[in-house]
Design a protein with these regions (language model features):
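A common structural microfeature
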Residues: 28-32, 42-44, 50, 67, ...
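Generic structural motif
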Residues: 37-41, 53-56, 65-80
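Surface-exposed strand-loop junctions at beta-sheet edges and helix termini
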Residues: 47-48, 53-54, 59, 73, ...
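Buried, small/hydrophobic-residue-enriched core segments of structured protein domains
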Residues: 68, 82-277, 281-413
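Short, well-ordered turn and helix-capping elements at secondary-structure junctions
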Residues: 35-37, 63, 260, 294
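Glycine-/proline-rich flexible loop or hinge segments
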Residues: 55-63, 98-101
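N-terminal, Lys/Arg-enriched amphipathic/low-complexity engagement segments
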Residues: 1-46
Length: 413
């Protein structure tokens, strides 16, 4: 039984060239472990620079939580580990070499054994805990887990295509996740196996209906004392494969699109793949920017971010911007600039109380923002609203400022 889909959202214009039909396997010559956007990881190396490593082998562990490790995205040679002050990870770069794979033993029975396996095999960081949108703490217990088998972001690959032929792995992963929580939700994925108590949520084609934050706000709002996790359905299938075979899958399905390309490409590549390698031979002449993520919420990057499954290549302006006195006056005006509530803003927030939420964000009103659903959201969930309003500063940045204040005040260090 499916819960009714959200009815609000926008159908975004397509600016990418046509998609090539069949995914191609493409392991780039370089790959890297990097923090997710906004994430700060204080790490300790487990392997020396220059050493040969197997795909899936633990390379780094968190200093504060040594149970949680980061694993090699491919077999190769660990070229360098770049750390910022405080031993915060910038990137750990690997050059492709060999085909070795690291095998994990079967986990101990029960939820604690599953936690230990996910934390020790690098899958824990693919979970995202709300509020605040970070990796769950080691001992955190979620009130619910939402599995996303739908994605309406512009240029995102269809998660159902990634799951094709992996239905058994997905069902095994879903059964495992059910042991970690009292409520398991599955968004999309009609016909895929899931435990009997799973609540299925229908998802429409409009954006942002396929974002976890909007579904969490509607079906299982996050609270400080009752966190909610979300995870991509492809990562759930990876967990199922790890449980039965002891090996982490080598690739994930990634779509490479954007107006600066001659064609849209669907690839199976390693996590942390080099974006330049994924775009090779299909970039149009001229200056361009590589983004990990969608055109709405992606950021400039050299390597694919940990949770991303799309790459956007957009053209850059080739000359200086035309000057105008009115635009210059607006840039010198006070901040934040007023946001005018419109129908587009209402649709971009998919049923959230748009005017009240924007007012709370602009005023820095933490209590009102909490009451209106901010604890279920992260920056990605407001990216379409930023696009619809051209808000300055962006609504997503205002949301992050409020979340950071709440976290500092309410969550023990």
């Amino acid at each position: 039984m499916f819960t009714a889909a959200l009815s609000s959202g926008l159908l975004l214009p397509r600016s990418a060239p046509p998609l090539s039909a069949t995914p191609i396997r493409m392991l780039t010559e370089e790959a890297a472990l990097t923090p997710a956007p906004g994430e700060s990881l204080r790490v300790e190396p487990l392997v020396d620079e220059g050493a040969l490593v197997a795909q899936g082998q633990p390379l780094l562990r968190l200093r504060a939580s040594p149970q949680i490790v980061l694993t090699a995205p491919m077999a190769g040679r660990l070229a360098r580990i770049e750390l910022a002050p405080g031993r915060r990870l910038v990137q750990a770069v690997i050059f492709h070499e060999g085909e070795a794979r690291h095998e994990y033993p079967a986990p101990a029975a029960g939820p604690e054994g599953l936690r230990a396996l996910m934390q020790g095999a690098g899958l824990w960081r693919l979970l995202r805990s709300r509020p605040f949108g970070q990796m769950p703490r080691v001992g955190e217990t979620p009130a619910a887990i939402l599995v996303m088998a739908a994605d309406t972001s512009p240029g995102a690959p269809d998660p159902m295509q990634e799951l094709r032929g992996r239905e058994d792995d997905f069902g095994r992963g879903m059964a495992a996740l059910a042991s970690l929580t009292g409520a398991l939700f599955l968004c999309g994925a009609e016909g895929l196996p899931a435990p009997p108590d799973t609540r299925r949520i229908a998802c429409g084609r409009l954006h942002p209906q396929g974002l976890a934050g909007m579904q969490i706000h509607r079906h299982c709002p996050a609270r400080i004392e009752a966190p909610v996790w979300d995870i991509h359905a492809g990562d759930v299938a990876d967990l199922g494969a790890l449980l039965v075979g002891g090996l982490l899958p080598e690739t994930r399905l990634v779509q490479v699109s954007g107006a600066a390309l001659r064609e849209t490409r669907l690839v199976r590549c390693q996590p942390g793949a080099d974006l330049r390698g994924l775009c090779r031979d299909i970039v149009k002449p001229g200056p361009h920017a590589l983004l990990s993520g969608s055109a709405l919420d992606g950021g400039p990057a050299q390597f694919l971010a940990p949770r991303d499954r799309q790459v956007t290549v957009r053209p850059l302006a080739s000359g200086p911007a035309r000057r105008h006195w009115f635009a210059a006056a607006l840039r010198r005006a006070g901040r934040p600039l007023p946001v005018i509530p419109t129908a587009a803003l209402d649709q971009a927030l998919a049923g959230l109380p748009a005017a009240a939420l924007v007012r709370a964000l602009g005023a820095g009103d933490d209590e009102s923002a909490i009451r209106l659903g901010a604890l279920s959201l992260v920056e990605q969930d407001l990216a379409l609203a930023d696009y619809a309003t051209a808000a300055e500063p962006p609504l997503s940045a205002q949301l992050r400022a409020i979340l950071d204040r709440i976290e500092a005040a309410e969550v023990p260090a």
